[in-house]
Amino acid sequence: MWPTGVKATVVRPFDPPARKWLSGHRGVDLDAPEGGTVVSAGAGTVVFAGKVADKDVVSIDHGGLRTTYEPVRPSVSAGDKVKAGDPIGALEAGHCVPASCLHWGARIGKDRYIDPLSLLYPAIRLLK
């Protein structure tokens, strides 16, 4: 499910670094209005809701997959269970100045970042 609640325009795509320690864009930026409701992309448990480097962040564990949403003023707390589509907070200004956008990230395990857009569309399987 789109964390904006509806299909959103991708302002900046996923751009993984060539090496884990190099710079890159480990998520996608989605066009969204400041103050708009941000929803959980899937069922899971909130593992973090608070500030990281002066930016509000919500992180949700989906059983080995973790999604992050920023800058989001949380309406949830660590330990809360959420379903896909449940509100988790409101989008704050500051990420895509002068416009507003939601940075949505996804990772498997400790450091394997994936394109969160891949969570929206099931894999296509060709039948033989």
What are these regions (language model features)?
Residues 37-46, 76-91:
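Short, well-structured beta-strand-loop connectors
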